[in-house]
């Protein structure tokens, strides 16, 4: 049962790379105290504009695809689940993702491709997420992945029953109302409240935020006074994820461990901490 370990149960997201990395991933998540991990697959490797001629293959992180994630989860059923993914503008993208959903995938994503967020092919994925009642996780990165962040409210309004999870640099940069230079991926310094991300989380019940990766950690630590208030206001909308590229979980070099420490430092109460590390993910992923 999720959360039955001594440490608070956590539901992070991660991606396996090569089979030889399997023991490393298992040990990494165990060192963090993670009880359930959701693996996010890459789409198939193709060379086309939506993958920046192959740059985005493997989620630009040498991640493997649907079959590898499903197989890993099947081999470790007590602690691993899997997502479903595909390059969205391939003719069989919907069919590929739907096949994985029928096999038990619990999320669509991570969608990390060079397409407009409101393009017809993306809207077909939102419709699929709605049909199967699964969330869709989107990597927002200006100039590279999921274009049109300032228009995304239209999709939130058009698909109110879809649980959207925002992730990555542009998503977290926009906690700041003064985030004007979109090319700055990891902005530093004080945050002015009222940024687009802050408003999406406040105004749309179907919008959630994934605290993983360097972008999530940066958002928590660049202005900790703001972060405390941000967490308090959005305590039911934020989810911990690991998304580490290190090999030694739980050490001072481990990004996931730093994120957990920041959450514990800034949450304000054990009840809020548990929401971010466990309860919100359990609800959003229907576990």
Where are these regions (language model features)?
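Short, flexible/disordered intra-domain loops and linkers
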Residues: 9-11, 17, 44-61, 173-191, ...
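Active-site neighborhood of phospho(di)ester-bond hydrolases with catalytic His/Asp-centered motifs
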Residues: 12-13, 38-41, 83-85, 109, ...
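Active-site gating/metal-coordination segments in enzymes
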Residues: 50-145, 213
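Conserved, mostly hydrophobic/aromatic
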Residues: 29, 69, 100, 108, ...
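Divalent metal-dependent hydrolysis catalytic cores, especially in the metallo-beta-lactamase
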Residues: 10-18, 24-55, 78-85, 105-111
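Generic structural signal for well-ordered alpha-helices
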Residues: 22-26, 66-73, 94-98, 122, ...
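Catalytic pocket-lining loop regions of alpha/beta-barrel enzymes
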Residues: 106-107, 115, 119-240
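Mid-to-C-terminal alpha-helical segments outside catalytic/metal-binding sites
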Residues: 1-37, 235-239, 245-287
């Amino acid at each position: 049962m999720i959360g039955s370990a001594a440490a608070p149960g956590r539901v992070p997201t991660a991606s396996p790379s090569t089979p030889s990395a399997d023991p490393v991933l298992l040990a990494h998540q165990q060192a963090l105290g993670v009880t359930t991990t959701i693996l996010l697959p890459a789409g198939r490797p193709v060379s086309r504009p939506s993958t920046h001629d192959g740059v985005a293959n493997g989620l630009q992180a040498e991640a493997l695809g649907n079959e590898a994630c499903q197989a890993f989860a099947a081999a470790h059923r007590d602690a691993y689940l899997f997502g479903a993914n595909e390059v969205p503008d391939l003719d069989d993208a919907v069919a590929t993702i739907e096949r994985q959903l029928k096999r038990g995938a619990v999320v669509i994503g991570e969608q990390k491709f060079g397409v407009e967020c409101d393009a017809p092919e993306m809207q077909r994925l939102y419709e699929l997420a709605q049909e199967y009642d699964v969330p869709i996780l989107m990597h927002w990165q200006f100039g590279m992945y999921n274009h049109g962040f300032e228009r995304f409210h239209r999709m939130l309004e058009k698909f109110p029953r879809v649980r959207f999870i925002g992730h990555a640099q542009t998503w977290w940069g926009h906690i700041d109302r003064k985030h004007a230079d979109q090319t700055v991926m990891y902005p530093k310094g004080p945050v002015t409240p009222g940024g687009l991300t802050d408003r999406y989380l406040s105004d749309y019940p179907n919008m959630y935020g994934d605290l993983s990766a360097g972008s999530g950690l940066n958002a928590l630590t660049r202005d900790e006074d703001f972060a405390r208030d941000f967490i308090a206001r959005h305590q039911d909308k934020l989810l911990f994820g690991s998304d580490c590229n290190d090999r030694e979980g739980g050490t001072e070099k481990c990004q996931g461990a730093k994120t957990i420490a920041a959450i514990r430092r800034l949450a304000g109460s054990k009840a809020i901490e548990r929401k971010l590390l466990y309860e919100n993910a359990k609800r959003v992923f229907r576990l």
